[in-house]
Amino acid sequence: MFENLTDRLERSFKILKGEGKITELNVAATLKDVRRALLDADVNYKVAKEFTDTVKDKAIGMNVLTAIKPGQLMVKIVHDELAKLMGGEASELHLSGKPAIVLMSGLQGSGKTTFSGKLANMLKKKQHKNPLLVACDVYRPAAIDQLKVVGESIGVPVYSEPDNKNVNEIADHAIQEAKANGHDVVIIDTAGRLAVDEQMMNEISSLKEHVCPDETLFVVDSMTGQDAVNTAKEFNDRLDFDGVVLTKLDGDTRGGAALSIRTVVTKPIKFIGTGEKMEAIDVFHPERMADRILGMGDVVSLVERAQEQFDEEEAKRLQKKIQKNKFDFNDFLKQIEQIKKMGNIKDLASMIPGVGKAIKDIDIDNNAFNGIEAIIRSMTPKERTNPEVLNQSRKLRIAKGSGTSIQEVNRLVKQFDQTRKMMKMVTGSGMKQMMRNMPKMK
């Protein structure tokens, strides 16, 4: 995410390396490079100019403390201004209606249907809501089926009327259905449309006026850069939406939309999509995004994702197994599955300070786990729970069954043994023993 921009900004800050203090001359040289980096990232020209002018005003003439190098101060100023540029603080959904209504809008192919499912899933799991998805795309033949597939995957019901082309009526009936069945949030998925399509824009404007949604969200593909910003402005002029959802942000190496949209549209970015899975949705935090853009990582978001996947009871159960040296391949497989649910591995690694830069040229994705999973799934229940029984003939059978080599099976078994020993060392009495064996501080 935003790798190109991160690299360019790092190079820009190197201009100040070795400088004793901030001067108008070295600030101008640095910010000229910063502005060029922003423009190359497809940031709106006016936004880039205003941003660098603000940073320049704050930096010039500032008395730098002897402990703070000019480069470090510039990073701090740029960080704070980036966070402000993207909204300053997270903007929450306001769901006060009974039921609360969320209306989706955007171009075709922007990811509205998938995001509708992600939002329903998040509200269900994190806020214990009982959402209802509503299919109001009456034009695309497969739209209703797509939403139903999404709904089934997360256990959320979908309301649809395949033979009705009146979206206002469908929404009315869906709200009645929600009230009758205790659904406290209604998420209305609509057809994709262009802002210049008068008939389609009139339809969604009428729908908004008819249902009076608590939130109207504009969903846009972040990888379209400035086009995303321009489209958002056109939609906002007609629809006056409440917030923006940036999808496919995990594949966006530039970041122009995220950095420009708040200033141009004057509406907050509320959510970001970071992958294809239903769990790949984050509340947008400008401060954290500024951290990531400047290569500082985002440990808070990483911990939050981990907490969503690992519950306390499971952690206690696992700890007991580790202490008794009973950690087995079933547990190992479960850990892999939970890590995969957290999102793209490279994206997760980039949240750890310093790691993103180290792995930027390495091709890492969740497919790296496929071989490990295939090997474990090719084991018998006895072999999974008792790894000690894995002799050469068993390993050969597992290699054939998993489509891997005997060397790969041996490597996994060796890594598993090392992991098990290390886990026992840090969770049980082994850690106390290690501490006792360490030389005393003099």
Where are these regions (language model features)?
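Long amphipathic alpha-helical segments used for membrane anchoring, targeting, substrate engagement
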Residues: 2-19, 288-442
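Primarily NTPase-proximal linker/entry elements flanking Walker-type ATP/GTP-binding cores
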Residues: 8-136, 143-164, 170-190
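Short, small-residue-enriched loops and turns at beta-alpha junctions
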Residues: 110, 139-141, 165-167, 192-196, ...
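Short, surface-exposed connector motifs at secondary-structure boundaries
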Residues: 126-132, 154-158, 184-186, 211-216, ...
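Short, glycine/polar-rich helix-capping loops at beta-to-alpha or helix-loop-helix junctions
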Residues: 141-147, 228-231
